[in-house]
């Protein structure tokens, strides 16, 4: 059985997609779960006649007995709860202790690190496989690097020691859950200087190999990128994406080398217009970071931001998309570029399909007799299997430019 938890916009989109993709009462046995029976019934009703027989499970995040019973009845738990630092630990603990596979949309690196440290031993003993960051952060980045490096090995005989990701274009609404998680992370960092230093460490998700420390070179402001021939600005999601990519590198035995470099950026175009756009976007990001760091302005900003669970209209989701490139270069100057695209709003439509396919991959793509339990990344656990699923069923493409 596959079981999904928590009511919200991402959950509604994901469940609508699953209902269309696998139905109810077929090969895939699944249910929706959360703490409010009335909201779950409302969600089920919104799915129409075809979802009328979808099972409902009521469980609260602070009820360990109910959570344990819930996860024992499932092969996979997929959760959209957030911010995860506030609501997510009890479900991770239940899955790790009971051998139930788990995936989520978490982009809170400091919380993921805490879960890795606290529950890796339990997961390894039970066989539970736990995979965070199964949405727009960080599947396109993590699987994009995996796809590019595999082609580099085939074409050049070695992996790239340097990769950069460029967001060429994207259209979609801001995710209330993602923004809430960012703000919660800022609040936690402000109150704990030690945590703030940890969050600035690009290797925060590699606690098993604490001696990693080769400096990464994230861009901090507008730059002209010679390889792409455009101006660019920082990409806000690099804060989690790069850390997931580096964890994948570590879990794989560091095949790209001890000095592997990875960065992400948002392309803004050529000429004066591109330069002005790069400066403008960089300034907006700096002002947003400053406003959420200062308590009075943070409270003001939060009044105007979408709340967790709120999302764009179905029409806006369909009109959304993303288009990114990843460029690798080796020491001989040889280069290869790939492209990763999605056909829906990245934060909702595409993310919902990514999470659903990650859940199905956990349920059906692995040998149950070989339970390699622990905390994984999308690339290191699902890799090519998930790429194929996303290309075949989720409107994504992975291609060589």
What are these regions (language model features)?
Residues 125, 150-401:
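C-terminal catalytic/substrate-binding lobe primarily of soluble NAD(P)-dependent oxidoreductases
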